[in-house]
Amino acid sequence: MTITLTENKRKSMEKLSVDGVISALAFDQRGALKRMMAQHQTKEPTVEQIEELKSLVSEELTPFASSILLDPEYGLPASRVRSEEAGLLLAYEKTGYDATTTSRLPDCLDVWSAKRIKEAGAEAVKFLIYYDIDGGQDVNEQKKAYIERIGSECRAEDIPFYLEILTYDEKIADNASPEFAKVKAHKVNEAMKVFSKERFGVDVLKVEVPVNMKFVEGFADGEILFTKEEAAQAFRDQEASTDLPYIYLSAGVSAKLFQDTLVFAAESGAKFNGVLCGRATWAGSVKVYIEEGPQAAREWLRTEGFKNIDELNKVLDKTASPWTEKM
């Protein structure tokens, strides 16, 4: 099935990609970034620190990315120093979730809308939802209605809607556990099926790889839960779960594991259309910035950060499929 895009959405999608492949840098982290910074200093990270680090990453790495994902809370200064060639996505959700309940309901930023995100110069709206396909029906209906609203907003503003799905299990506390690894493919692929329906108005899915590669033979250091063939089948099932373009998030794994995973995904038959890669690219700059200052962080980004993004781009050249084949 080929999906039809409006002229404006097509132009925006082209601005966000290079030759149909989305090689985007993700730096919309807020809560996670504050926690990373807090590991290296005793005082609470300041707004100025967060804005400065985001701006450094944007300035130094967007010349090598097709686009950058930022948040409107701390990322607007960074959006203004990005490469002229790089597109911009802005996150629409509040960071984090209420840990006292298993529902993880979504919430929009209070003073933002799809209209305002477009006015801020973004080519796309990105929204994150936590979803448990096997969770309570009442909660999941609330989440579906929420995404329908955002889809309608994005249609009205004629701006692409990138939906990020992070899966979880209401009964399993640790997503890194073997217990969750056993159900991850089901969680990821079934959630993709749900939100690929036309009623949600999603243009691109930003998703997890369907297997925790740390439990796959040939990738695992310890316990092996999956053969390579079982893992490959999960990627094939993922490809079959949607007609929409989909891109992978790096989920905080190392640059090397993420790159190896992309190669495995492509060899398995996943026709993914790029990545929104965050911590796997820039995480090392946080410690340097806090301990040695902005100039040292800039130097790290020009060397290690560049190496990470350059290696990733080379892998994408060999593995990713253009979204233009689907739209």
Curated annotation (Swiss-Prot):
**What are the UniProt keywords, alphabetically?**
Lactose metabolism, Lyase
This chain's protein is named Tagatose 1,6-diphosphate aldolase 2
Q: PANTHER family from the entry?
A: SULFOFRUCTOSEPHOSPHATE ALDOLASE (PTHR39340:SF1)
Q: In which pathway does it act?
A: Carbohydrate metabolism; D-tagatose 6-phosphate degradation; D-glyceraldehyde 3-phosphate and glycerone phosphate from D-tagatose 6-phosphate: step 2/2
E.C. number(s) listed in UniProt: 4.1.2.40
Catalytic activity, as annotated: D-tagatofuranose 1,6-bisphosphate = D-glyceraldehyde 3-phosphate + dihydroxyacetone phosphate
Give me any GO biological process, just one: lactose catabolic process via tagatose-6-phosphate
From what organism does this protein derive?
Answer: Streptococcus pyogenes serotype M3 (strain ATCC BAA-595 / MGAS315)
Q: Does the keyword Transmembrane apply?
A: no
- Family per record: Belongs to the aldolase LacD family.
Please list the GO terms describing molecular function.
6-deoxy-6-sulfofructose-1-phosphate aldolase activity; tagatose-6-phosphate kinase activity; tagatose-bisphosphate aldolase activity
Task: Spell out the InterPro entries in the cross-references.
Answer: Aldolase_TIM (IPR013785), DeoC/FbaB/LacD_aldolase (IPR002915), LacD_aldolase (IPR050552), Tag_1.6-dipho_adolase (IPR005927)
